A protein has these predicted regions:
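Conserved beta-strand-loop-alpha-helix junction that forms the acyl-donor binding cleft
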Residues: 124-136, 153-154
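Conserved acetyl-CoA binding element of GNAT-fold acetyltransferases
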Residues: 73-98
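Conserved acetyl-CoA-binding loop-helix of GNAT-fold acetyltransferases
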Residues: 90-114, 141
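Active-site rim helix/loop that mediates acceptor-substrate recognition in acyltransferases
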Residues: 28-54, 67
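A short beta-loop-alpha structural element at the N-terminal edge
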Residues: 3-19
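C-terminal "cap" of GNAT-fold acetyltransferases
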Residues: 148-174
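Conserved acetyl-CoA-binding loop of GNAT-fold acetyltransferases
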Residues: 138-149
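Glycine-rich phosphate/pyrophosphate-binding loop shared by adenosine-nucleotide-utilizing enzymes
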Residues: 2-4, 57-65, 75
Length: 174
C-alpha cells in the first residue's frame, strides 16, 4: 500500500479542516475566509471534487486536501492545502512529489486534471502571485500554462490564473 492516499471527506473531518484554515493557514489566502461547521457541511455535500490527503503510515492522519468545483465541464480549483510539516520535511515532500501516492495517477492534482479531461474540460488554478512553490509545481511538474493576471486581487498581491488543458501526466518534463 502507498504511504499516502486520497479519500472523500466526512462531517467528522470538519474540525481538522477548520484547524487547517484557522491555525496552519493563518496569514495565507486559505485563512482569508474561515468556514463555519455549516459552511464545511455544505462544501462536503456539494463540491464535485473534494479529496483529503491521508498518511497511511500515521494512522490515517489527514494532512491536506484539494477542493475544486465543476463549472460546466471544467474544474475550478478553490483550494489546495498541505500541512507545513508535509511541505517542509524533505522526506515527506519527496513522497508527495514522486511515488508516495503509489503513482502519479493517484496524486491529488493529477486526479483533478484527469477528472476535467474526462469531461472535455480544463483545470483552472488561481494562485496568489507570491506562492512560488505552487506556481513552480503548476508550470514545471504539471504543465499548466499562464492564462492571465488580475492585479491586486489579494491587495497588494496579484492573482495569477493557470490552466491545464492537455490532460497530460505530471512530471513528464522533470
Amino acid at each position: 500500500m502507498a504511504r499516502y492516499s486520497l479519500r472523500k471527506p466526512t462531517y467528522e473531518d470538519i474540525p481538522r479542516l477548520q484547524y487547517f484554515e484557522q491555525v496552519e493557514g493563518k496569514g495565507t489566502e486559505i485563512g482569508l475566509v474561515l468556514k463555519s461547521e455549516d459552511d464545511w457541511k455544505y462544501v462536503i455535500d456539494t463540491y464535485e471534487y473534494f479529496l483529503l490527503c491521508v498518511d497511511n503510515e500515521e494512522d490515517g492522519l489527514v494532512w491536506g486536501y484539494i477542493l475544486a468545483a465543476q463549472v460546466e465541464n471544467n474544474l475550478w480549483i478553490r483550494e489546495i492545502f498541505f500541512c507545513k510539516e508535509y511541505r517542509d520535511d524533505p522526506e515527506k515532500r519527496k513522497n508527495i512529489k514522486l511515488e508516495g501516492f503509489g503513482g502519479v495517477e493517484n496524486m491529488p492534482l493529477y486526479g483533478a486534471v484527469k477528472y476535467a479531461k474526462e469531461r472535455g474540460g480544463v483545470v483552472i488554478a488561481p494562485i496568489a502571485s507570491d506562492n512560488e512553490r505552487a506556481i513552480s509545481a503548476m508550470l514545471g511538474a504539471y504543465g499548466f500554462r499562464h492564462d492571465r493576471t488580475i492585479e491586486r486581487w489579494y491587495d497588494p498581491k496579484h492573482l495569477v490564473i493557470y490552466i491545464e488543458d492537455t490532460g497530460t501526466k505530471p512530471y513528464q518534463n522533470v
